[in-house]
């Protein structure tokens, strides 16, 4: 028998739900060691761009599109055509869009004011007191958070064992900075706060007169004012829920921020009460897009249609015939856009080389321990839990493991001596000359970062034969690689070899959780070279020839060098194949570096590209995924020989082999979602760098080992550094939402979307575009939302910019 809740209990439940919704409106950020791209609009994917723009403008002053001038320049240059503008205009809400095409163009030529967030109580108090309370809160909160969240950087670690709120309370009751600034009695105010974060939030909401309708918006704003610290707490919640648990940290941070608001209200209420009443009411008003925001969304849509038109023209060009006989080499790369340049170069070196694209973790979601390490590296997409465990080498490398551990302990002891409070002064005097050689080699870029050189990884525990066979079959079918195997098949993971770069993991493989991809590739090569596994695959219709050898490789995206792990599977019969592959890879690397040099600042030729990763002063060792704008899942023949400029994710997929459309479902729910996170992180860091970007690399300091701050402290900066999206003179990334192109029946695509609401929301609300390719690989159908499709007009390959032949 259930009992009705008391009004107070019901109110508390509603408040708790509002706090939870505010927490989920915040995107997570991963620590630097395993940094991956995250969609900064993750909490707004249930809304359209214009509606999300209204919400984010209210709580953080965020613009969700580029300034109007950016669009106007492209209209004037003819990049965005009248057809693009008209089609985007027709797709917008009738009651909010400009009256006609002329009005839309006039709007593009006019500036709009930068959005301003509703003021917090800290902002209002700053206005009447002259004290920068928002800045002081950010500084004091950041000083505490850097210690609390520290992952080993601090020599004197903060005490652990308490929740975030209790830990902050213990520190802040001894911090007199707020009182010196004029907030008298703040330490006492903190000390007498309720024990639970939820009770603190409830008390603050009551004292501030916050109505239920205003809570979601106001709580969201409070977390946004904490910058990357709130995002890191959201990461803790993400990880806990992925493991089947929960985490209270982000709620604790909301309570901390509200204690500041509450204290400032008690201090300045007589002077700010009228303005606060107006602000509170505004927080309670429904979120709605404005005509200006709809106009901005139309211009954004038009820019994307222009890019889609260019892509359609590229895909409409006559296809190159598939390799008729056995390929001279097959090389599978990650779908990462950087692989597109190298794959095209490799195919041009020898047209009988077949390249494939697949998610860089190669279907093996493993928690891996490197040599001499007890740390589990989650080398898998962050959407997944590890299904396997692996380690570097077996019992035969035990002595090497012990030796490496001794070296690591000695290095840590040396580091503690070097940085300790007392010995650091003597250290410089006593050992400074020893570092002359290192300083010279580092300054001249003569010493690269150590490359991955662990023994071949092994599954631990090992899988039985049936599980190994099932895993191999699943991966090969997902790769659409079930026949016509070459003598040598290379499985190339990718990584980046850079120095002096806190964001180095962001250059690694996102599908491998921010680590390089050689471990997964080496595990798969071992699986596919297993003769018992091959025998088990034959009844399943996958016959791998006895003379086929699988080898793992690592593609260094900074230098375009390819390292083959030939020693993992020695084969005298394949020495010529391996030598020839190395020659082809070297030639392709030279071509790829030459192409990339055209985009990189101060890269005069391909030779200078290879040195950038070793330069301690280089803020742009490579462009990583800047410029990404398309995802194509189709047979490679649809794109072979056509330059996509390193801006497209390429996933091999043959729907005719996918009888149950299980692979299609996997592509839409995993690689497409990961690619959307990447694309939208670049988008957010470009259109709103002050909120969704990491700031200026030249000002970065690593804090807590988890992230960066600009200068000496303050808010953690999440997202991409400015140097990752801008070359100093112009943008290196065009902020366009990703266009996903899939060669598969529309009914099958719609069926997958109908069973995955979160994925469908990305397309229905316009965060991604979706196209179905016809059997010639042309963009034939556009997804119109609500599981509906509209036919695209034929694209003339000879006309790079077709125009509508209608009067407007």
From Swiss-Prot:
The keyword Nucleus belongs to this UniProt entry's keyword annotation: no
Binding site for Zn(2+): 334, 336, 494, 509
Domain of life (superkingdom): Bacteria
GO molecular function, one term: zinc ion binding
Family: Belongs to the inorganic carbon transporter (TC 9.A.2) DabA family.
Alphabetized UniProt keyword annotations: Cell inner membrane, Cell membrane, Membrane, Metal-binding, Transport, Zinc
Organism of origin: Rhodopseudomonas palustris (strain BisB5)
One Pfam family this sequence matches: DabA
Lineage: Bacteria, Pseudomonadati, Pseudomonadota, Alphaproteobacteria, Hyphomicrobiales
Annotated InterPro entries: DabA
Cofactor: Zn(2+)
Protein's recorded name: Probable inorganic carbon transporter subunit DabA
Record's bilayer topology term: Peripheral membrane protein
GO CC list: plasma membrane
Function: Part of an energy-coupled inorganic carbon pump.
Subcellular localization(s) per the UniProt record: Cell inner membrane
Subunit field text: Forms a complex with DabB.
